[in-house]
Amino acid sequence: MTRWLWVSIILTVLVTAGTVYVYFDPEFNALLPDPVPTHWNIHGQTDKWTPKAEVLPYFLIGPAAMGLLCLLTPLLPWLSPRQFSVEPFRKVYDYVMGLVVVLFAYLQGVILLASFEARGALINWLVGGIFVFFALLGNVLGQIRRNFWMGVRTPWTLASETVWNNTHRLAAWLFVGVGISGAVAVVIGVPLWICFAGIIIAALVPIFYSLWLYKRLEHEGKLDRSDLSAPATVGSDASGQR
């Protein structure tokens, strides 16, 4: 197992054990309000409450997602077709999967702390952590090669290695820029809806860019030769053998 997978497994065990302990320990349980706040809107206001006796499944959603990621980390490379293998960027793949687990661990801690107070005052910490994640992800986004599991996977990036690489270079700059500026914006008190607008822009621009770039290269006849070759049909194979 890789170092990042070990980190993910250890974090998952610790977060799961910590969550269960917080719920069942008499002292911590006594501090939980009843009902417990389990969802907050974009303004940090609680908009969903759950009876204390029924809140444990909500608390375990994060650890369950972390456990699923630990299972998928070694499984997805095995499932990948040879042409879209993650092996050429395996270290980056392991890093990204581990980074997502770390994000879930951080969010779990913030959510547990926020559950002890109805005002959801820690919402800025939650959003700020997401922006830091975007910046760290953007730092390696340009190193991800064509695959089916992570990155900007549009029909045009998957169809052309050139489009994939150029799109991910652009996405890397956008993610780092939005991640850093968004984290700073949260700290100085910019409204959260403005911060989230940056995430939407960073997610949509690479999609439209990949379409534009593919069509431009196609029009100019500059698509990779390997991208232009179509798989042979059964009929053509049979005729070629005769």
Residue ranges and their predicted role:
Residues 40, 44, 80-85, 147-162, ...:
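Cytosolic, membrane-interface loops and tails of multi-pass inner-membrane proteins
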Residues 4-11, 58-63, 69-71, 93-103, ...:
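Select subsegments of transmembrane alpha-helices in polytopic membrane proteins
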Residues 105-121, 177-194:
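Alpha-helical transmembrane segments and their membrane-interface junctions
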Residues 28, 66-80, 136-152, 210-220:
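Membrane-water interface of transmembrane alpha-helices
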Residues 8-23, 63-75, 105-108, 133-135, ...:
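Hydrophobic core of alpha-helical transmembrane segments in multi-pass integral membrane proteins
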Residues 71-122:
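Ordered, amphipathic secondary-structure segments that act as subunit-interaction surfaces
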Residues 48-67, 120-137:
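Alpha-helical transmembrane segments
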Residues 22-57, 150-159:
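Active-site and channel-lining beta-strand-loop segments
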